């Protein structure tokens, strides 16, 4: 298995900007891969993606220096093993709320003796000599549970102490929903920012990395300065819609009298 460039980047003390693929299109993935992202995540939870479209996106991105991640739809070992066999270099897993759930996630991502992942990297192991992938996969694949509920915050220390995770990823929408707020990104409430500060402090203490989903480049930059080491900006469909709306509005701003 080739080295995980995102893992190497983190070890060098650098942050990473992450793209997000909701559109089930190899061409969309290819276009995104040319845009300078350090990593790109295929979203199987809320994106319009399935396993076949995920593999097609991976194939389209293969020529570009982006680390390929997947957000799985749930903490289920069959799904997790399948996306890793398909070539994912990391798993972002939603709704990890307890130590036991986190341990199950790690086990599903790691080959024995560190875990229970079944051997069969049908695509991931297709490059290199037989057995080479299995020798390095445990050291290269990133395991990233999502922190997005009040229960996860209550169990944060226990989750972060689970051996084998590489960091955590904040889902601000579900987290704020769990805290009784309207779900949205780029929160400014002091109580939410205090939660982020705690996450950064506790991950740093353990040599782990914190990631967060953002809506805007400005907020993402703030999060990097505050200590997050993986920031996602919206997703491909959101970026497309934003650019399209701005283009249409820009035309009418120039010639509004013709409308």
Q: Can you annotate each of these PLM segments?
A:
Residues 1-259:
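Expand to "…catalyze enediolate/carbanion chemistry for C-C bond making/breaking, isomerization
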């Amino acid at each position: 298995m080739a080295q995980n460039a995102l893992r190497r980047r983190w070890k060098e003390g650098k942050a990473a900007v992450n793209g997000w693929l909701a559109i089930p299109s190899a061409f969309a993935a290819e276009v995104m891969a040319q845009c300078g992202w350090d990593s790109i995540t295929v979203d199987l939870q809320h994106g319009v993606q399935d396993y076949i479209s995920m593999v097609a996106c991976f194939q389209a991105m293969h020529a570009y220096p982006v680390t390929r991640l997947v957000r799985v739809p749930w903490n289920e070992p069959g799904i997790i093993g399948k996306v890793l066999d398909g070539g994912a270099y990391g798993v972002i897993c939603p709704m990890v709320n307890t130590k036991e759930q986190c341990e199950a996630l790690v086990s599903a991502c790691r080959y024995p003796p560190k875990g229970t992942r079944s051997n069969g990297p049908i695509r991931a192991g297709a490059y290199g000599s037989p057995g080479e992938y299995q020798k390095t996969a445990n050291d290269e694949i990133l395991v990233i549970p999502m922190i997005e509920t009040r229960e996860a915050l209550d169990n944060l220390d226990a989750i972060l102490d689970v051996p084998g995770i590489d960091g955590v990823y904040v889902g601000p929408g579900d987290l704020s929903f769990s805290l009784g707020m309207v779900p949205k990104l780029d929160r400014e409430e002091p109580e939410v920012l205090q939660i982020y500060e705690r996450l950064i402090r506790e991950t740093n203490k353990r040599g782990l990395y914190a990631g967060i989903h953002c809506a805007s480049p400005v907020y993402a930059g703030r999060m990097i300065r505050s200590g997050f080491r993986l920031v996602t900006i919206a997703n491909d469909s959101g970026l497309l819609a934003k650019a399209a709306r701005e283009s249409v509005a820009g035309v009418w701003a120039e010639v509004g009298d013709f409308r």
